[in-house]
Amino acid sequence: MSNKNLEEGFEDIIAELDKEQARVKIRMEMRRFGKPTTLLEGLRMNGKELQELTTKMKKSLATGGTVKDGIMILQGDHRERAAEILKKQGFTESSIEII
């Protein structure tokens, strides 16, 4: 096994451990003009991974959104559906808290 493959294997293991140990909080907040916004905090991902997950979420939920200061922001109230998508991505149910 080459060093590159070994490093990739470790990165995969670390990513899985991060998903298991993450404490993701999903909450809704009313923003400007009374518009609901879903916030996902505590995802413990690097910027690129978080941006990729945000893109998947936006496509699945047919909504707009962005990442700001490590927090995923989605337009609309998508708390339940966002939790289901995170479970499919490998996050455990006990690590997801819907507020």
Predicted ranges, named:
Residues M1-E41, M45-Q51, K59, T66-K68, ...:
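Long, charged, low-complexity intrinsically disordered regions
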Residues I71-Q75:
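A generic structural motif
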